[in-house]
C-alpha cells in the first residue's frame, strides 16, 4: 500500500478568511473566481484529500487565527501527516523552527531566535496557538518567506537588479 504523502498547510498566502474583516458566518469553498457555501465537515474532508491547503487571514484579526487553529485541528484529525508553512518567517530561520517543533526552545527563546518583533512585528499571541499546535503534534513548520531586503530591492530596482546568488532560490515572477 502506498503511504499518504504529507500535505502542506500554508498560512497567510490566500486570503480565504480575509474576504472581510470578520470571519464569514458560514464556510466557503473558493475555486478559481467562484465561491460557494459548503458544510464545514464536507469542506474539511475535501481539504484533507488535497496536497496543499491555503488558509489566509487578516494578520491582526484574532478570530481569523482561531479559525485557522480550528481548521488545522480538524484537518489533523483526518490526516495527521502534514507540514505547515508560514509566510511570517524568512527561510534563514528554518533551523529555529525545527528546534521549536522538536521541543528544544521555550516560547520566549523561539520568538527571540526568529526575531519575531523585528521581522513580523505583530502580536505573537495571535500566532502562538498555531505554533504550539505544531509543536504539540510534532508537525514540521516551514519558513516560506524571503528577506525583506530582497523584496525591497526588487520593488525599488526591479528583478534584474538582484544578482542571481541573492535571489534566495526564487525564480523570475
Regions found by a protein language model. Give the residues of each.
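Bacterial N-terminal signal peptides
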Residues: 6-17
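Histidine-anchored nucleotide/phosphate-binding helix
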Residues: 66-77
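Membrane-embedded segments
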Residues: 61-66, 81-83, 91-101
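N- or domain-start disorder-to-order transition segments that initiate the globular core
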Residues: 19-50
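Solvent-exposed loop/turn segments at secondary-structure junctions
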Residues: 58-61, 89-93, 147-151
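A substrate-binding/cap region within the structured catalytic cores of diverse enzymes
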Residues: 95-173
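Short hydrophobic beta-strand that contains or immediately precedes a catalytic carboxylate
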Residues: 53-56
Amino acid at each position: 500500500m502506498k503511504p499518504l504523502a504529507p500535505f502542506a498547510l500554508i498560512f497567510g498566502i490566500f486570503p480565504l478568511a480575509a474576504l472581510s474583516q470578520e470571519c464569514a458566518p458560514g464556510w466557503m469553498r473558493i475555486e478559481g473566481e467562484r465561491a460557494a457555501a459548503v458544510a464545514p465537515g464536507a469542506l474539511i474532508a475535501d481539504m484533507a484529500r488535497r496536497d496543499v491547503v491555503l488558509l489566509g487571514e487578516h494578520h491582526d484579526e484574532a478570530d481569523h487565527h482561531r479559525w485557522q487553529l480550528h481548521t488545522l485541528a480538524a484537518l489533523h484529525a483526518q490526516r495527521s501527516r502534514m507540514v505547515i508553512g508560514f509566510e511570517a518567517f524568512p527561510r534563514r530561520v528554518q533551523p529555529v523552527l525545527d528546534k521549536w517543533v522538536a521541543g528544544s526552545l521555550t516560547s520566549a527563546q523561539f520568538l527571540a531566535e526568529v526575531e519575531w518583533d523585528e521581522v513580523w512585528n505583530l502580536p505573537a499571541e495571535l500566532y502562538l496557538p498555531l505554533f504550539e499546535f505544531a509543536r504539540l503534534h510534532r508537525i514540521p513548520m516551514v519558513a516560506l518567506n524571503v528577506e525583506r531586503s530582497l523584496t525591497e530591492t526588487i520593488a525599488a530596482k526591479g528583478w534584474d537588479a538582484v544578482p542571481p546568488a541573492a535571489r534566495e532560490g526564487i525564480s523570475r515572477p
